[in-house]
A protein has these predicted regions:
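S-adenosyl-L-methionine-dependent nucleic acid methyltransferase catalytic domains
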Residues: 1-161
C-alpha cells in the first residue's frame, strides 16, 4: 500500500517548489510521481534498481566516467549515452521526440538536470529513473511539480510487472 511522503502536513504536494524540497523529506528509496513515474533515490547500479527495470523504448544515460550499467543494453530498445558536459534540456527533448513517442516508457539512470522528469512527463512519456545523489534526486522530484508518493520496494515489483 503506497504511503504519502507527508501525510501529517497540509502542504500541497501536487505543486512543490524547489524552496519546499527540504520539506519533502525525500531520502533513499522509491517514489511514485503522479501515479505513473517511478524514481529511485539510490545507486542505480545496484541490483534493487536493475532487477525491476522494465523493458523501455529509450534509456538516456548522462554520465561522466562511472559506468556500471551494462544491463541497460538488455532493457532498452535504444540506449543513448551522453557525457555530462554535452547534456542540455533541449537535447533531451530532441532525443525523446526522435526515439520515443507518447505513452512509451523511458529510463534515466541518472538525473543530472532537475528538469528531466518534467520534460519527459510533458511529452507524455512514462519515466523509470534513479539518482544516487539524494540532493539531486530531491530537486528533480520537487522541480517536477508532480504528486509524490513514497512506496515500499516490494510494491515496485508489482508496478513494473
Amino acid at each position: 500500500q503506497p504511503r504519502s511522503v507527508r501525510q501529517d502536513q497540509d502542504m500541497n504536494l501536487s505543486k512543490p517548489s524547489p524552496e519546499q524540497t527540504s520539506e519533502l523529506m525525500i531520502q533513499a528509496g522509491w517514489y511514485q510521481l503522479e501515479g505513473r513515474h517511478l524514481v529511485f533515490c539510490g545507486d542505480t547500479a545496484a541490483q534493487v534498481f536493475a532487477a525491476w527495470a522494465p523493458l523501455v523504448k529509450l534509456a538516456i544515460a548522462v554520465t561522466g566516467n562511472d559506468w556500471a550499467h551494462d544491463w541497460l543494453i538488455d532493457q532498452a530498445e535504444n540506449v543513448v549515452v551522453l557525457p555530462t558536459a554535452e547534456y542540455s534540456d533541449d537535447k533531451l527533448k530532441q532525443l525523446l521526440k526522435l526515439l520515443s513517442k507518447p505513452g512509451d516508457v523511458v529510463m534515466f539512470p541518472w538525473l543530472p538536470s532537475e528538469n528531466m522528469l518534467t520534460t519527459a512527463h510533458k511529452l507524455g512519456r512514462t519515466v523509470y529513473a534513479g539518482e544516487e545523489n539524494i540532493e539531486k534526486c530531491r530537486w528533480a522530484i520537487a522541480a517536477s511539480g508532480l504528486n509524490v508518493t513514497a512506496i515500499e520496494p516490494n510494491y515496485v515489483a508489482e508496478l513494473v510487472s
